[in-house]
Amino acid sequence: MASRINTNFTLIPNQKLRRSNRQTSCYSKTLGSGFQPISTFGNFKALPLEIFQIILKYLSVKDISMLSMVSKTVSQHIINYISTSSGSKRLLLQDFHNLELPDRRQDSAILEHYRSLGLLFKRCTLLLPTKERLKYIHKILTEVSCFKFNGCAAPMQCLGLTCYGMFLQTLTAGWDELECHRVYNFLCELTNLCRKIQMAVCSKPGSAQKLELRIRLFCRNVLLDHWTHRSDSAFWLTRILKPWPMVNQARLLYIIFGPISPQDGQVVWQEMIEEPTDEFSLKGLADAIKLLYDASTKEWTADDVISLVDELSVVPREWLLENNARLLMLSGNNICFSFMASKAVNGRTIELARLVVFLALVCEKELYCMDWTVKMMQKVCKVFSTPVERKNFLQNVANAFACVIMEMLQSIMSGDRDEDDRSFLNLFHLVHAQANFHKEVLYLTMNTPLST
């Protein structure tokens, strides 16, 4: 039975547009003999593949990415183009050490390029299983030496790992946790990351400085720094930390987020144990601790994070208590209170009292409100179950102020001149901290607001 042709359209006079008439006639015959679907390669079907690839050279990465979604056939031809030497040379920019342009404009441009490239690979490999996607992408990216763990001779001046991280973040955005687990395992196998981490955390701190630096740069630039959602950052940080015992987790956390030398980027292990440090040196560690504490996952309980903070405070040896206090303050009220409450519950009241003294000292130095320390102490007092325990704790706080002042005074009397100047300034701040602390306690006791 012949097919019926729909004639509900405007007729065009034959003498005009003869080419259109021939196309209509041809189209009618096609319908009459059974409908044939248009090629998924569209109008590009008439072109040799060489011409199609030449056209791709004139398109931006974003445009090629959009084009890859037209059909499976087009996507496959784009994959083939990427695999060619000319395609990979054009798409895999390797200008990672160009410091000529001001205001880091070059950095921004190449990062945006690899963000777009990640989206292109995400779309082109959409129909492949995760394992096959990763194998194909690795095959293409293996040409870029600066993407490798030890690939760049000047890693501190290189944007390679940062671009690689931007690429991976765009590629894996929206993937479920199982797929992201596979990505992490693939990267670990590719770089032998677990073995390298084991060597770093089991060695004497600072004895493998180059390895520590490589681990820090790879973990930060590739796995952690590009995520916009905290839950994603927590997921990847958990993958890095969780395979290891708590003591190694603390060492690894310090390697990744601890203070580094501005000259060579190497981890500074002695900073926390030799002298008071600043907020900048501790901010990375504090942010990582908050990230794990706030993570809505069963993999990190509050007790886990507090234990990690406790372990961190003795890496590589016991920190100055002022640095420990500063880290707790930067980590936020919840973590600070939980840490102090843990000491109260475990009967470590003398340690807790000294910590209160140094919280007050940090408040004084940084011009924070001293009533924060007093209110934190008041909150911790409620953890003690009996009035006798509370009274004993408060007595320990008063004694701790006196003891720390005497320790600083002895340090001044026995030290050299330069040391004297720093110690005297620290003593000056502590005496003022004690005065302001007790002033706040008096206001609280007399129930008199400070503003009156």
Curated annotation (Swiss-Prot):
PROSITE patterns: FBOX (PS50181). Coiled coil: none annotated. Widely expressed, with highest levels in kidney, liver and pancreas. Down-regulated in tumors. It holds the Pfam family ARM_FBXO47. Residues 41-91 form the F-box domain. Keywords: Ubl conjugation pathway. Part of a SCF (SKP1-cullin-F-box) protein ligase complex. Probably recognizes and binds to some phosphorylated proteins and promotes their ubiquitination and degradation. This is F-box only protein 47. It comes from Homo sapiens.
